[in-house]
Amino acid sequence: MKRSFLYVIFSLFLLLLPIGQTTANSNDSIRLSLLTCAPGEVIYTLFGHTAIRYENPSQGIDVVFNYGLFSFDIPNFALRFSLGETDYRLGVIDYPHFAGEYAYFGRSVWQQTLNLNNEEKAELIRLLQENYRPENRVYRYNFFYDNCATRPRDKIEESIAGKVIYPVEPQDGSRTFREIVHQYCKGHPWARFGIDLCIGSEADRPITQRQMMFAPFYLMDAFAGAQITGDSIQRPLVTDSELIVDATPEEDESFWIPTPLQSALLLFILTAAATIYGIRRRTGLWGVDLILFGTAGIAGCILAFLALFSEHPAVSSNFLLFVFHPGQLLFLP
């Protein structure tokens, strides 16, 4: 009887062993990765993009969690955008469609495989699924502090049992938001001019390495050298990095447009010529005053509106209001 009992127990053990191995192998086959996408040509794509890829081959899952979705069709979009009340949302799309879209627009994509254990993988998946619930997926977008790059970083850090230690950045505390904006607006002078016009002195303060991660490629570089510490064990945050969409950027086929500097020089020359002409003719050219004071006054109205009412970061302390201010409209002829 005793031998029969032991035989039954041993048989059950053999039957359960493959199941346990299958579960472990299934968990081990799950891969979670940080995706970093190259910049595009449209102004809201100039800084690149970040997303999280979730692969579970045993269940046929290969999807991308994307915190960068918004719609121009929402009511009063332009007003809400100027007020800094633009709501973004988390979306989920299958990876082939995601990769195909970026390849179509000539934007490369890099993948960094996250070095998470099974518990951390399960926790990150749970956090993403919880965040994707209809009542949780919408969030108030903030360009510098809460965007499509900072959200994935925060969720990944939240899922890790230990602490993520980022490598010491030589430029930590020496760079500013404005400098990073200039870096990504290279080749787009009017975008740089418009952003420079709107953001104030707060954008010129030195920022930390963590604050630099609002830009996707700064986040990618930080992840590449980051370490996870906990229980006296240290491991890299990223185990593998690869270029998964190798795309050729679209050629710029737009017609020539003068830069802001060229436009300013042209305006100066025309104004000087009109002034000389008016002095020699002993006549006032009210049209010139109308253009100059009208343009400066309208620009001042926009800057004052942003400084007083907008939730956008770094727009309240804008000293350009001393140059462009609404009061100049009072001097219109």
Question: Would you name each region that the model predicts?
Answer:
Residues M1, I19-T22:
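Generic low-complexity segments that are intrinsically disordered, proline-rich and/or Lys/Arg-biased
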Residues L14, N142, V323-F324, F331:
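Generic ordered-secondary-structure signal
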